[in-house]
Amino acid sequence: MVLARRGVPDAGTLVLTLACIVGAAGGSAVLNTVLDERMDERMPRLSRRVTLLRSAGRGRVAAAGIAAVGAALAVSATRLNLVVCVLLAAAAGGYAVLYTLVWKRRSPYGTVLGAVPGALPVLIGYAAVTPRLGIDGVILFLFLVLWQPPHFWALALRHQEEYRAAGVPVLPVAFGEPYTKVLIFLYAAALPPLSLLLWALGFLSPFFGWSALVLGAGFLAVYYRETVARRRYGRAFAASIVYLVCVMLALLADILLA
């Protein structure tokens, strides 16, 4: 939203957009929990989620998830604009239906496809400010699409035995650790150049360009060390979060402090 506005968006639009994103994302996550119940009960780190689901009642939980998504779509259509509504529907449906029921269960590359609905909040925020999606918004969207697979694959490497027991064909289970590490690094290596496009195409200043360059170099060094050299996948997972947050903070600082 800040990128689209080139400044702070008005409070009303900001609150409504965040409420719609939280409602749609939360509702989709709830539906994902219901649909993944049998899979999750075979994974120790997610078993408590199944216990809570059953104690609350599957029907009530599913109804709450559908209601949250429906409310988000209704508010976005009436108070924001139809582009936001369509993107919200694509994000919620893509995650709760396509990713949960199809991509994750059938393909080792489900994470790559699932990254699209996961990154749509970037375009949703942009469209809330202006329905005409700009190239800068598309670049940021693609950055989030490419960021998610290596982020998740680090987690999948750490918990690959749980995924194997649950029958989820994540990349390490389907193709092994060496292949997964190669893809992790290829995706990670694409992130710094993509972020630099925001400076190279004139959307942001040299401050962001230098920040993105330094952050990208540090991220790649840490990611290689933790995934390839030391096999500390939990740290690699955390490092990707820190990298994303720092890039977004650099973007905000570049615009708001200019």
What are these regions (language model features)?
Residues 3-37, 44-45, 86-97, 137-147:
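Membrane-embedded alpha-helical segments that form the functional core of polytopic membrane enzymes
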Residues 49-52, 70, 112-129, 178, ...:
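Small-residue-rich segments of transmembrane alpha-helices in multi-pass membrane proteins
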Residues 217-247:
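Interfacial loop-to-transmembrane junctions
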